[in-house]
């Protein structure tokens, strides 16, 4: 299950209560999970078979992208970093943390091999854009406008960091 801004974990809890013999995987951004951290206690108290995967980029990524495509520089979307592994462990929930993409496969195998709740904190690039399946001309114009505003507002370093993070992911012939 995947949910933006706080619905992945409640859906996963419902699915786990419906069938306790099935492993449920909840994919959540750090912003959405932080809105419902108390539900981790529900997982623990009921020993629900839910693996919570947190995409931890220390930003409200979708909110940021929505602002950028509307021509506004992102404002108040970055958050202080949180170590969700330590947070889960403080609740006696087994947890793992991935900071290197090469560790993903083995970490997920470890997580899925456990019974009961487990949290996987996947640290991701805060500048990596979540690209929608289709992009309109208006979104391109809005994004270009917001980047221009950022540059003229003294944020050229941020624009360059975003460009570097995203250009490396474009396939080359």
Residue ranges and their predicted role:
Residues 1-173:
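Thiamine diphosphate
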